[in-house]
Amino acid sequence: ESKLTLTNNIKFDQASALDASVSGFLGLEHSSRKVLVGGSTHDPEETVLLQTYQAVKKHCPQLLLVLVPRHPERFETVARLIHKSGLAMTQSASANSVSDDCDVLLVNEMGKLNAVYTVADFAFVGGSIADRGGHNALEPAARKLPVMMGPNTYNNPVICAKLAESGALFIVEDAAAMTELTLSWCKNADAAALAGLAGYTVLEQNSGALDKTMKVVELYNN
């Protein structure tokens, strides 16, 4: 007799359980600026995001780019990259707020991504233009954000497929594609909100794996 029972992916529960009390980052929750977050980025993704920012800013001057590198040992490298671009930068570890003339906020602290997503309007999830398989797209989806990733999503193929099918996740291969999509969201807030809501709905519909798994374990142990 088969004892195989299928439950949902526990990652949906982990994203649903993100601390709802975490809200705000450096006062950006009170800002009217549009915020594009590059979360868990690797080389060359910061370069792609900086190119995107420079192109979109011509049409959306209030846009703020927030970069959250995956590895702390790259903080200084990314800071030099931003400086070289000529854009005005703030580094979070030494800031209490973000001025209106700041172009790029570099989050040079660990453990801040969840808070950063609460002040974002759009998100790019890293490790996906860089060939790292892609990081967790459910984290921004839990904050009702429209999500972009590169083509490398093999770490979480089912999750990414569900988000893409729902209209919440969009694949961008380069700065040109990222620019086009970001600009469309800047111009059409309703479309961005709809995409974000679609991702949140996927998350809600697929949660409960942990509860189901524990019930199955309990059943087989009795």
What is the meaning of each model-derived region?
Residues 1-222:
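Nucleotide-activated sugar donor-binding and catalytic core shared by glycosyltransferases
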